[in-house]
């Protein structure tokens, strides 16, 4: 009889944070909105708060970067560790150290689904439909997958069943699709800058931006718009038709997460051939099932916000059953190891975090060491061939552990 590998139990879980409202600003890391001054990601981008003039110019003005980065580390009895990062900051640390720890410590490193289910059910009474609590659960889940991979000596994508393609090809999210084309990306997704409170003038300005980039990038380069929950159905429909002459590939997250009827109407009225996408700020498996039923073309969960890798795999299955694509919101290695195993993810997102979009910078810089970036718009699966998620925690960052147990 062959020997079966004996897996260790989890000895301890620890939680740190960096950046956010109670720490230094501009720390970057898992909270990629926490950038310094003069960064494209904070430059007059349309949001649900843009209708208030005092919060229109800057997303940081209404507090988009107050949470900061959460870092969760799990340690096995044999001394091996796994970790992950997300957006939950100091409040996420409290949830991990004072509540979720009881479901983690003492379990086998392979008990990921059991721990996941217990965390979800134990927080139902205060988690609502996602948000901070789900971000925290996601971070724990990713740390568990990282630890499991390191214990058995395999990359996470092989734990999921292996790659279905040799490489991942990327589009870039930034303000300069023309520069993204020069770097080898297959497309560029720009933020919108205007919303319903700006009327038809706002539509004309954003459509003119698309027209300008179409001229600069040529006919074959993908162009997309990210509307970040800032519109209503009528405005989004008019904007989609205004951009149709410039071959806009898709229009993204026009409406707040729970407006399912609005997404159904938008998909029904969008120009033929233009895709409607959403999902970045949906936080539960059930919400993605309902979103899928609206008939949108691409679901875009964030693996650090939707419940972790365990939930992302389930979301991909829902999308596949309906013939939909799942293209996760850019989450670096945490997305890479998942999407290379999904047959309904033919491309992925890379979120540019360099201030002017002119250079390649790892998305979660500086919190991850050895974080890969696309080369000529691609990452080969061999780059992912390291145990776990293949990155290490940069302990030189100003990590704070406000709670213990």
From Swiss-Prot:
E.C. number(s) listed in UniProt: 4.2.1.90
Positions with a binding annotation for Mg(2+) = 226, 252, 280
Q: This protein's superkingdom?
A: Bacteria
Question: SMART domains, from UniProt?
Answer: MR_MLE (SM00922)
For this chain's record, the cofactor binding note is: Binds 1 Mg(2+) ion per subunit.
Quick one: which residues bind substrate? 33, 59, 349
Extract one GO BP annotation from the record.
amino acid catabolic process
Q: What EC class does the entry list?
A: lyase
Sites annotated Increases basicity of active site His: 302
Q: Which SUPFAM superfamilies match?
A: Enolase C-terminal domain-like, Enolase N-terminal domain-like
Q: Which UniProt keywords apply?
A: Lyase, Magnesium, Metal-binding
Q: Where is the active site?
A: 329 (proton acceptor)
UniProt catalytic activity: L-rhamnonate = 2-dehydro-3-deoxy-L-rhamnonate + H2O
Question: One MF term in GO for this entry?
Answer: L-rhamnonate dehydratase activity
Q: Which CDD domains match?
A: MR_like_2
As cofactor, the record names:
Mg(2+)
* Site (Transition state stabilizer): residue numbering on this chain: 349
Q: Which family does it belong to?
A: Belongs to the mandelate racemase/muconate lactonizing enzyme family. RhamD subfamily.
Q: How does it assemble?
A: Homooctamer; tetramer of dimers.
- PANTHER family associated with the record: ENOLASE SUPERFAMILY, MANDELATE RACEMASE (PTHR13794), MITOCHONDRIAL ENOLASE SUPERFAMILY MEMBER 1 (PTHR13794:SF58)
What function does this protein fulfil?
Answer: Catalyzes the dehydration of L-rhamnonate to 2-keto-3-deoxy-L-rhamnonate (KDR).
Miscellaneous comment:
Reaction proceeds via a syn dehydration.
Question: What protein name applies here?
Answer: L-rhamnonate dehydratase
Q: What organism is this sequence from?
A: Escherichia coli O127:H6 (strain E2348/69 / EPEC)
């Amino acid at each position: 009889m062959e020997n079966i590998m004996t897996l260790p139990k989890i000895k301890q879980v620890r939680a740190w944070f960096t950046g956010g409202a109670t720490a230094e600003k501009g720390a970057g890391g898992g909270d990629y909105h926490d950038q310094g001054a003069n960064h494209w990601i904070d430059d007059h981008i349309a949001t649900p708060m843009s209708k208030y003039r005092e919060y229109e110019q800057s997303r940081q003005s209404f507090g988009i970067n107050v949470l900061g980065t959460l870092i969760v580390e799990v340690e096995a009895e044999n001394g091996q560790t796994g970790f992950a990062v997300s957006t939950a900051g100091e409040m996420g640390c409290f949830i991990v150290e004072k509540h979720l720890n009881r479901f983690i410590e003492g379990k086998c490193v392979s008990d990921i689904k059991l721990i996941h289910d217990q965390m979800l059910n134990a927080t139902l009474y205060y988690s609502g439909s996602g948000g901070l609590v789900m971000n925290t659960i996601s971070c724990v889940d990713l740390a568990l997958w990282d630890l499991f991979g390191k214990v058995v000596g395999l990359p996470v994508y092989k734990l999921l069943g292996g790659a279905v393609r040799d490489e991942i090809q990327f589009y870039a999210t930034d303000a300069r699709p023309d520069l993204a084309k020069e770097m080898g990306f297959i497309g560029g997704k720009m933020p919108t800058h205007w919303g319903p409170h700006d009327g038809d003038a706002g539509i004309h300005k954003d459509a003119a931006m698309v027209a300008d980039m179409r001229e600069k990038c040529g006919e074959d380069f993908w162009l997309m718009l990210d509307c970040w929950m800032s519109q209503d159905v009528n405005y989004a429909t008019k904007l989609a038709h205004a951009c149709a002459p410039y071959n806009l590939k898709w229009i993204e997250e026009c409406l707040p997460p729970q407006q399912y009827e609005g997404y159904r109407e938008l998909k029904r009225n969008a120009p033929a051939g233009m895709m409607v996408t959403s999902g970045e700020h949906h936080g539960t498996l059930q919400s993605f099932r309902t979103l899928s039923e609206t008939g949108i073309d691409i679901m875009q969960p964030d693996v650090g916000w939707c419940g972790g890798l365990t939930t992302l795999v389930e979301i991909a299955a829902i999308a596949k059953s309906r013939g939909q694509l799942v293209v996760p919101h850019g989450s670096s290695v945490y997305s890479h190891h998942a999407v290379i195993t999904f047959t309904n993810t033919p491309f992925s997102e890379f979120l540019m975090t360099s201030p002017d979009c002119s250079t390649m910078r790892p998305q979660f810089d500086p919190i991850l060491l050895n974080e890969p970036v696309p080369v000529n718009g691609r990452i080969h699966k061999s780059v992912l061939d390291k145990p776990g998620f293949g990155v290490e925690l940069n302990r030189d960052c100003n990590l704070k552990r406000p709670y213990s147990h």
